[in-house]
Amino acid sequence: MNREMTSSFLLLTFAICKLIIAVGLNVGPSELLRIGAIDVDGHFTVHPSDLASVSSDFGMLKSPEEPLAVLHPSSAEDVARLVRTAYGSATAFPVSARGHGHSINGQAAAGRNGVVVEMNHGVTGTPKPLVRPDEMYVDVWGGELWVDVLKKTLEHGLAPKSWTDYLYLTVGGTLSNAGISGQAFHHGPQISNVLELDVVTGKGEVMRCSEEENTRLFHGVLGGLGQFGIITRARISLEPAPQRVRWIRVLYSSFKVFTEDQEYLISMHGQLKFDYVEGFVIVDEGLVNNWRSSFFSPRNPVKISSVSSNGSVLYCLEITKNYHDSDSEIVDQEVEILMKKLNFIPTSVFTTDLQYVDFLDRVHKAELKLRSKNLWEVPHPWLNLFVPKSRISDFDKGVFKGILGNKTSGPILIYPMNKDKWDERSSAVTPDEEVFYLVALLRSALTDGEETQKLEYLKDQNRRILEFCEQAKINVKQYLPHHATQEEWVAHFGDKWDRFRSLKAEFDPRHILATGQRIFQNPSLSLFPPSSSSSSAASW
């Protein structure tokens, strides 16, 4: 052990001993000191600023709780060594992978007894994206940001097929949930476009998995909320990247007509169609004041008051058509053909044209504006729901025209998806209907705003929305779920619960991983540690 390593080890030992004395941890000193002795190519840190940086998330809804230490890995084996230490200790301690910290309810937290693995690429020498143009895929580190995956694949004229609206999220983070945006109706979520994974299980094994190898783990990890393993590598399917995007928004005053048009657009299999279908709700004139307003400009103003509506709610359909510079005349004709089939308010067409990369990265530009006004790092009591098609009209009446009370405090997305684009073998949960909607209430709380913008008001409104769905027997499923009890989790997973629990017992029997999800009890104290641990290491 060289001088630098010795210094780091002593610092870590000192910090751990201080914590033992100060808070009376359940984990024994001899077990904790093993953390500092783990031989990794990356590094551990207990620096106060590093601990603080991983103790909160984008949601800012939980009181910060600093972990024992943070691991900055440089390889999957670094992650595996830490997890093997946790798994083999007399008293197992939590290990949580953290990507870009974009969770809402502390899902990536490890607690004061645990260690956070900082997966975000760039801190240490983790592998760079490796594009295979001939085979149309890219291999990426689990902590790579999607925006960097995009930049790398575009060098080869390629891009992933399915996206999220915001690109500053990690690959492992979105694949542990699903990863959805307006392309999901056609390509499915991001988890439907994965060819292969390397995963560090809760036993510290590095396992390669795909449709052909370790299939049960492969499907379990996709949408598995980090419960069975930490994704260290993903092989993502690619397609030829377009150069430009025709971006169109149109308004509706009738919810029925709005949803009929959306459902028509996602049903056009094998036909001329738009490449992206989303939508959002306008319950006040906040459309031009939220982070999705970058589409509009003084040259393309939105005069909501000039559009008549029956009541206070309008609906905006958002669609795009991808194309190459050489196809500009063709795209005009295609858009005209597609638009003729829709029944929007004729005077409400807003169109812009931009580079493909600029469209995909549109939310980040709005983020920079909000950051400049100190409006980004505020509490985000987001609520994301999958609503079955058969009950979306009831949801509109009860929530959009009812509970929300003509105030948004942020964007409200609504768009349909096709269930047959989701692999039922994954751990992701969707309603039991062939078409279902995402309804995403992406609100921000302000301490010095109106009462309807305060955190407690918005949290109470979320509670009322969930209560309304339960009382009205609208079988919604939470996306990016957060539940308080295991009974609620059992209800959430439904028919998938038995398999989910079985996977946990097989791949993380001591409940070490992703304890911040609060699905299972904290790391098992009753299971005696194994006498030895094996590792079927995979490399790439």
Swiss-Prot record:
InterPro entries: Cytok_DH_C_sf, Cytokinin_DH_FAD/cytokin-bd, FAD-bd_PCMH, FAD-bd_PCMH-like_sf, FAD-bd_PCMH_sub1, FAD-bd_PCMH_sub2, FAD-linked_Oxase-like_C, FAD-linked_Oxidoreductases_BP
Top EC group: oxidoreductase
GO molecular function: cytokinin dehydrogenase activity; FAD binding
Reaction catalysed by this enzyme: N(6)-dimethylallyladenine + A + H2O = 3-methyl-2-butenal + adenine + AH2
Pfam family, one: FAD_binding_4
Keywords, ordered alphabetically: FAD, Flavoprotein, Glycoprotein, Oxidoreductase, Secreted, Signal
Subcellular location: Secreted, Extracellular space
Family: Belongs to the oxygen-dependent FAD-linked oxidoreductase family.
Protein name: Cytokinin dehydrogenase 5
